[in-house]
UniProtKB/Swiss-Prot annotation:
InterPro entries reported for this sequence: MoaC, MoaC_bact/euk, MoaC_sf, MoCo_biosynth_MoaA/MoaC, Mopterin_CF_biosynth-C_dom
Catalytic activity: (8S)-3',8-cyclo-7,8-dihydroguanosine 5'-triphosphate = cyclic pyranopterin phosphate + diphosphate
Protein name as catalogued: Cyclic pyranopterin monophosphate synthase
Organism, scientific name: Lysinibacillus sphaericus (strain C3-41)
Coiled-coil intervals, chain numbering: none
Amino acid sequence: MNNFSHWNEAGRPKMVDISEKEITTRTAIARSTITLSNEVYQAIQQGGIKKGDPTQVAQIAGIMGAKKTADIIPMCHPIMLQGTDLQFDYEKIDNGYALHIQATVKCNGKTGVEMEALTAVSIAALTFYDMCKAVDKTMVIKETYLVEKTGGKSGTFTHK
């Protein structure tokens, strides 16, 4: 357990003390992909989703998810976010479409926003599924990962 910062000397969970860290500009980009059938894609394009435009609702849900990360991930610090944005890009694949969801989160703070970006894309993907499940429940939420992070003591990370 010594390699993990969220454990105290007694082996119990703790929230890491960031009080001595420098305030720096921090950004994180995360991505998630959900695959969907041609039927779901056509329903979206034709305005046939009864609950409304799933990407618009997923965008709002993703932003809300980023803002609420500290409420649902136990050891995350509450962070004053300066910006959160999501992008949605469809890609035609062999058996339907892939929707790539990307979140960019930014703050000036003492700790990074990686979890906020990952939460944003996760909540957006779940919301998209919820919005479209009446048409087809075979959608699959696939890989969710950190694309890049900048700022802080550890500097820049880029997923390869």
